[in-house]
Structure formats: C-alpha cells, structure tokens
Amino acid sequence: MGILYSVWRSKEMSDFLLNVSATMSRSRANGPGLRAVVWVQGCTIGCAGCYSSATHPHAAASLIRPSEISEWILSIPDIEGITFSGGEPFEQAAGVLETIQAIREEKGSDFSVFVFTGFELEVLQRSEDDNVLTLLEYIDILSAGPYDYKLRDQKLLWRGSRNQSLHFLTQRYPSANIDDWIFQSPLEEITLTSDLINFTGFVGPKSKMLRAVEKIITTNEAI
C-alpha cells in the first residue's frame, strides 16, 4: 500500500524541499530529553478533533531545503535529538529523510530521532515508497496511529488517544523508561516571545494552562 504525499522541489536545485509549518529549537514535550522540533505542513489523514488542524492543508507554508533545516538543528547546542511532527512527516518522507541523514552524518546515531505519524506502523512497513521504508530505519521512537477524539486520554505519554501506540524501533531508548518519562516530559509546553504564545503538547489548543497564560497577557491579572 502506497502513501500519498506531496513533493516540493526547488526551481534552482534538484533538492527536495520541506513544507514546514513551524519549528522550535528546544522542547521537552515532544519526546525524550531536550529536542528540536519541526512541524511539517500537510496531512491527508485529517483526523477529526486534531489540535494541529491548521497543519492539514498541503498548501505551501515555508518551503525550506533539508540542508537548511539540518544546519539549523546542528547549530543548536545541548539537544539530544530531533522530533518531526505535523502535519504528516511521512507524506514528505524524502525531505525528512534527507534532513535526518545530513544530521546523522555530523552527529552519528547518538543524535536521536522521534517522529509522530497518523499512520499505523504496519501501513508504513507495507509502503512501496523506498523513502518511507528507509526513513523508518533512522527512527528511534515512532508515535503512530490516527488521533481518535472519542479515545482521547490526557494521561498518555506522547500520544493523544488510546488507540495510538509508541514503537521503539532501535535499542537507543528502553521502553522501560516510560514511567520516568511520564514525570520528566510535560504534557503542555508554552514558550513566550515578545509577540507570540507558542503552545505544544497533548491536552488541546484551549487547555487550562494556555487559557491562564492568555488571561495574564491580555488583562495583566495574576492567577
């Protein structure tokens, strides 16, 4: 079974381009430890109730060469890995793979890879796309499966609903560490800049924490 995905190419170069919705240089809510995060733009799965629904359209957001993304990631000190989310990373498997390969050439396998996908692992393993199959070989942890609003669970680690599953595809991270990660990895993460509130996590776009921060910023009220 193949996977539908969009391929963007530079007009000046043969490189694949990643259609990127957003990036974060440091996050503790999107995988083990301190990680950079890339949210790709575009997802044909379109799960109902997805709190990243703005990343579903395959319209061009920021088209970036994988080499530029990898250089940015390599410039960030003290992170242990990269996380790809979305959107759907496997619908841009060629660009994601090229990015990870460039990073691994510099950092080696000690630099870990975490990917969120709405596809089940078995579907990805049956793909006829070589980029999808090769990408799987680079991933340490895969959070897989479509989000099901009826099965949502705020206590899950790096998942939004009970039908989703974590797959440890290498020996890098023992699955026995899950209990420790539950306490170390926040469910919600908010970073503030001079003009933006950046929210990431697994509780929902209008969670208690986010509403509280919005209240402080808009009214200067303490809680």
Give the label of every model feature segment.
Residues 4-39, 48, 52-58, 187:
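N-terminal [4Fe-4S]-dependent radical SAM core
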Residues 16-22, 34, 52-130, 134:
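Conserved Radical SAM active-site core
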Residues 92-107, 152-196:
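P-loop/Walker A phosphate-binding loop and immediately adjacent motor/lid segment at beta-alpha junctions
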Residues 128-151:
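Structural recognition of alpha->loop->beta junctions
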Residues 117, 170, 201:
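Short beta-strand/turn micro-motifs composed of small residues
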Residues 45:
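Cys/His-enriched microdomains
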Residues 185-223:
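Charged phosphate-binding loop/patch that engages nucleotide di/tri-phosphates or the phosphate backbone
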